[in-house]
Swiss-Prot record:
Belongs to the universal ribosomal protein uS7 family. SUPFAM superfamilies: Ribosomal protein S7. One of the primary rRNA binding proteins, it binds directly to 16S rRNA where it nucleates assembly of the head domain of the 30S subunit. Is located at the subunit interface close to the decoding center, probably blocks exit of the E-site tRNA. Pfam families: Ribosomal_S7. GO terms for biological process: translation. One of its GO terms (molecular function) is rRNA binding. The keyword Glycosyltransferase does not apply. HAMAP family: Ribosomal_uS7_B (MF_00480_B). Part of the 30S ribosomal subunit. Contacts proteins S9 and S11. It comes from the Bacteria. Keywords: Ribonucleoprotein, Ribosomal protein, RNA-binding, rRNA-binding, tRNA-binding. This is Small ribosomal subunit protein uS7. GO terms for cellular component: small ribosomal subunit.
Length: 156
Protein backbone atom coordinates (compact mmCIF):
# COMPACT_ATOMS: atom_id res chain seq x y z
CA UNK A 1 0.00 0.00 0.00
CA UNK A 2 1.34 3.44 -0.85
CA UNK A 3 2.04 5.77 2.07
CA UNK A 4 1.14 8.85 0.09
CA UNK A 5 -2.31 9.62 -1.24
CA UNK A 6 -3.66 7.36 -3.95
CA UNK A 7 -3.81 9.12 -7.30
CA UNK A 8 -7.05 8.60 -9.22
CA UNK A 9 -7.21 7.49 -12.80
CA UNK A 10 -6.83 10.23 -15.41
CA UNK A 11 -10.13 11.30 -16.97
CA UNK A 12 -10.18 10.65 -20.70
CA UNK A 13 -11.89 13.15 -22.99
CA UNK A 14 -14.61 11.73 -25.26
CA UNK A 15 -13.84 11.55 -28.98
CA UNK A 16 -14.89 14.59 -31.04
CA UNK A 17 -17.20 12.84 -33.53
CA UNK A 18 -19.30 10.40 -31.48
CA UNK A 19 -18.72 11.82 -27.96
CA UNK A 20 -17.79 8.36 -26.68
CA UNK A 21 -15.10 7.78 -24.05
CA UNK A 22 -14.72 4.14 -25.09
CA UNK A 23 -14.03 5.17 -28.67
CA UNK A 24 -11.49 7.77 -27.49
CA UNK A 25 -9.70 5.05 -25.51
CA UNK A 26 -9.76 2.80 -28.58
CA UNK A 27 -8.19 5.57 -30.69
CA UNK A 28 -5.46 5.97 -28.06
CA UNK A 29 -4.72 2.23 -28.11
CA UNK A 30 -4.56 2.21 -31.92
CA UNK A 31 -2.32 5.30 -32.02
CA UNK A 32 1.31 4.76 -33.03
CA UNK A 33 4.11 7.30 -32.34
CA UNK A 34 1.66 9.90 -31.02
CA UNK A 35 -0.15 10.28 -34.36
CA UNK A 36 -3.64 10.69 -32.98
CA UNK A 37 -5.24 12.31 -36.05
CA UNK A 38 -4.10 9.34 -38.18
CA UNK A 39 -5.52 6.90 -35.62
CA UNK A 40 -8.83 8.82 -35.52
CA UNK A 41 -9.02 8.79 -39.32
CA UNK A 42 -8.48 5.00 -39.35
CA UNK A 43 -11.13 4.38 -36.67
CA UNK A 44 -13.74 6.67 -38.24
CA UNK A 45 -13.17 5.19 -41.72
CA UNK A 46 -13.49 1.69 -40.26
CA UNK A 47 -16.70 2.61 -38.42
CA UNK A 48 -18.19 4.17 -41.57
CA UNK A 49 -17.42 1.12 -43.72
CA UNK A 50 -18.80 -1.20 -40.99
CA UNK A 51 -22.04 0.77 -40.78
CA UNK A 52 -22.29 0.70 -44.58
CA UNK A 53 -21.79 -3.09 -44.77
CA UNK A 54 -24.06 -4.07 -41.89
CA UNK A 55 -26.64 -1.29 -41.95
CA UNK A 56 -26.39 -0.86 -38.16
CA UNK A 57 -25.34 2.16 -36.10
CA UNK A 58 -21.58 2.88 -35.86
CA UNK A 59 -21.37 2.76 -32.09
CA UNK A 60 -23.76 -0.21 -31.79
CA UNK A 61 -21.44 -2.41 -33.86
CA UNK A 62 -18.39 -1.18 -31.95
CA UNK A 63 -20.05 -1.87 -28.57
CA UNK A 64 -21.21 -5.31 -29.72
CA UNK A 65 -17.73 -6.21 -30.99
CA UNK A 66 -16.19 -5.10 -27.68
CA UNK A 67 -18.79 -7.03 -25.68
CA UNK A 68 -17.97 -10.24 -27.57
CA UNK A 69 -14.21 -9.83 -26.99
CA UNK A 70 -14.28 -8.78 -23.29
CA UNK A 71 -12.83 -11.52 -21.06
CA UNK A 72 -14.62 -12.40 -17.81
CA UNK A 73 -11.73 -14.37 -16.26
CA UNK A 74 -8.01 -14.67 -16.88
CA UNK A 75 -5.12 -16.57 -15.32
CA UNK A 76 -2.34 -15.02 -13.24
CA UNK A 77 0.85 -16.79 -12.23
CA UNK A 78 1.18 -17.44 -8.51
CA UNK A 79 4.23 -19.05 -6.95
CA UNK A 80 3.44 -21.46 -4.13
CA UNK A 81 6.20 -23.48 -2.49
CA UNK A 82 8.57 -23.78 -5.42
CA UNK A 83 5.99 -24.36 -8.13
CA UNK A 84 4.08 -21.82 -10.19
CA UNK A 85 0.33 -22.17 -10.62
CA UNK A 86 -1.87 -20.46 -13.17
CA UNK A 87 -4.62 -19.11 -10.91
CA UNK A 88 -7.91 -18.02 -12.52
CA UNK A 89 -9.02 -14.54 -11.40
CA UNK A 90 -11.94 -12.34 -12.38
CA UNK A 91 -11.02 -9.39 -14.62
CA UNK A 92 -11.84 -5.88 -13.38
CA UNK A 93 -14.19 -3.88 -15.68
CA UNK A 94 -11.57 -1.30 -16.72
CA UNK A 95 -9.08 -4.05 -17.58
CA UNK A 96 -11.80 -5.95 -19.48
CA UNK A 97 -12.26 -3.02 -21.83
CA UNK A 98 -8.52 -2.43 -22.17
CA UNK A 99 -7.82 -6.09 -23.00
CA UNK A 100 -10.72 -6.27 -25.47
CA UNK A 101 -9.51 -3.17 -27.31
CA UNK A 102 -5.90 -4.33 -27.33
CA UNK A 103 -6.89 -7.75 -28.69
CA UNK A 104 -9.06 -6.16 -31.40
CA UNK A 105 -6.19 -3.94 -32.55
CA UNK A 106 -3.66 -6.82 -32.46
CA UNK A 107 -6.00 -9.08 -34.44
CA UNK A 108 -6.66 -6.32 -36.99
CA UNK A 109 -2.93 -5.70 -37.48
CA UNK A 110 -2.39 -9.38 -38.31
CA UNK A 111 -5.13 -9.49 -40.97
CA UNK A 112 -4.44 -9.44 -44.70
CA UNK A 113 -6.63 -6.61 -46.01
CA UNK A 114 -5.04 -3.62 -47.76
CA UNK A 115 -5.49 -0.69 -45.36
CA UNK A 116 -5.60 -0.65 -41.57
CA UNK A 117 -9.13 0.81 -41.69
CA UNK A 118 -10.31 -2.19 -43.76
CA UNK A 119 -8.59 -4.64 -41.41
CA UNK A 120 -10.10 -2.97 -38.36
CA UNK A 121 -13.57 -2.88 -39.92
CA UNK A 122 -13.37 -6.57 -40.89
CA UNK A 123 -12.13 -7.63 -37.44
CA UNK A 124 -14.83 -5.62 -35.64
CA UNK A 125 -17.55 -7.02 -37.91
CA UNK A 126 -16.24 -10.54 -37.23
CA UNK A 127 -16.14 -9.82 -33.49
CA UNK A 128 -19.70 -8.49 -33.53
CA UNK A 129 -20.74 -11.81 -35.11
CA UNK A 130 -18.78 -13.79 -32.46
CA UNK A 131 -16.01 -14.97 -34.77
CA UNK A 132 -12.54 -13.77 -35.67
CA UNK A 133 -9.10 -13.79 -34.07
CA UNK A 134 -9.93 -11.46 -31.17
CA UNK A 135 -12.90 -13.63 -30.10
CA UNK A 136 -10.69 -16.72 -30.41
CA UNK A 137 -8.17 -15.05 -28.08
CA UNK A 138 -10.91 -14.52 -25.48
CA UNK A 139 -12.04 -18.14 -25.84
CA UNK A 140 -8.43 -19.30 -25.30
CA UNK A 141 -8.10 -17.20 -22.14
CA UNK A 142 -11.42 -18.56 -20.83
CA UNK A 143 -10.39 -22.13 -21.67
CA UNK A 144 -7.09 -21.63 -19.81
CA UNK A 145 -8.98 -20.34 -16.75
CA UNK A 146 -11.42 -23.26 -16.93
CA UNK A 147 -8.55 -25.77 -17.14
CA UNK A 148 -6.92 -24.26 -14.04
CA UNK A 149 -10.10 -23.97 -12.00
CA UNK A 150 -8.61 -26.40 -9.46
CA UNK A 151 -6.13 -23.71 -8.38
CA UNK A 152 -8.81 -21.06 -7.77
CA UNK A 153 -8.34 -21.38 -3.99
CA UNK A 154 -4.85 -19.81 -4.38
CA UNK A 155 -6.48 -16.47 -5.21
CA UNK A 156 -5.10 -13.48 -3.35
Amino acid sequence: MPRRRVIGQRKILPDPKFKSELLAKFVNILMVDGKKSTAEKIVYTALDSMAEKSGKDHLAIFEEALENVRPAVEVKSRRVGGSTYQVPVEVRPVRRNALAMRWLVEAARKRGEKSMAQRLAAEMLDASENKGTAVKKREDVHRMAEANKAFAHYRW
